Amino acid sequence: LLLSILFNWITLQRSKNFVPSKNKNEERLSSKYVPPFGGIACSIAFLISTRLLGQTESNFLYIGFFAVIISIIGLLDDLYNIKWYIKFIFQVIIVYIPLYNLNIFINFESLIGIEFNNSLNYIVSTIWIILIMNAINFIDNMDGLAVVVSSAICIQIAFLTNYLNQYKLTDISILLLCAIGGFLFFNFPPAKLYFGDSGSLFIGFCLGFMSILYNWIPENITIYSSTLNPILLVFSVPLIDFLVVVTYRISIGKSPTIGGTDHISHRLLAKGFSEEKVLTIF
């Protein structure tokens, strides 16, 4: 938590006068420029604290390496506004490689009673994590909202993994919660820092993998629970917002990849709710 506060403070001081070519404010109701680099500080604090507290199991390190890569892609998008399809291609590659090499997946084939040598499992798992990443990215549309939602998810995953005696994953969840919590001091309305794509993609990537790993049966890492029902509930808030926004934009002939003020949070604000009340609702 303290590391996150420190790194976010340093980031704020260093980025006050730096305006990237992509201005995330156009997707928010605020006209004031806010640096979108808070996610970098959070990711650095999370990775350092993970290392300091000895959570260096090879699987976690491998996933962490690709989490850094996806954060870099997000940073480049914050700076240079990468085309959505290029970013999507990178997301597919960066998510699929650790899933395949670590042989971890959602056991979707068992759920539907067919066998494709895990090919379908990897496809579904890749889609799931990419969906989570972009849902977290979408819900980062109002001061403090992505922090509140991501923190709630971390807490729920911590309880789930602790219940299943997955204590290392519980520790990782708490460390991620602390990294996000330190950022809240700078993102609570009125925000001084935004997550940016670098942060939302990093957080979404980590949460997505944690959602799969919580079902891990240590005796055989290739076997996972055939259902994601608890996790679907855990991620219901960002997923519902994502699906509502995408469906609405398609229905009016607008590209889902073009940002706007049509999220559930914006609709609540338009009905007269304050930002603090919207955060409480979420």
Features from the language model and the residues they span:
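Alpha-helical transmembrane segments
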Residues: L1-L12, V19, C42-I72, A146-F282
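Juxtamembrane helix-capping/reentrant segments at transmembrane boundaries
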Residues: K22-P35, K192, H266
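Hydrophobic alpha-helical hairpins/lids featuring a short glycine-rich hinge
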Residues: I63-Q91
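Short acidic, Gly/Ser-rich segments with clustered Asp/Glu that frequently serve as metal-coordination loops
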Residues: Y80-K83, L131-I153, S200-L201
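Transmembrane alpha-helix boundary signature
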Residues: I48-S58, L76-I82, L99-I114
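Membrane-embedded alpha-helical core segments of multi-pass
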Residues: V68-I69, F90, I94-L102, V124-N134, ...
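Transmembrane alpha-helix interface/packing and boundary motifs in multi-pass membrane proteins
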Residues: G74-D77, I132-D140, L184-L193
